[in-house]
């Protein structure tokens, strides 16, 4: 949201406001823990939470987990790539997202449906992640996963969507894909 405010302020010629919100739009860097390579909650002393598990669904992350919310820097993909150590490391992390499957003991929330590894297509915060392979010059992986989702998670039946339609987002993803 901060980045959007900055862009609007810039278009309106409000440089001071734009600069403030561009700076705020980089705050995601403050919760990136290089030791775990995830965005991670901090405690009241500013230290990263010690018992953090990226695949856990906790009160610190709304309707998702650390794997799914890591990629929520849509306004600065190049910055996120840089945080992870470059395109090769970023692509490896993407690969892990799609291959690190929940265990049989994991109690997934109701909204975590359409799972491919930690990617939850049934919950909208993941929808853009498949396309991030394009940013690291591996478009064939985007194409492979998009085809998989379209062919396996959208069915010609009353239960045709694998998740919550949320104002048409599931259908819109399909149409745009």
PLM segments and residue spans:
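Active-site core of glycosidic bond-cleaving carbohydrate-active enzymes
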Residues: 1-177
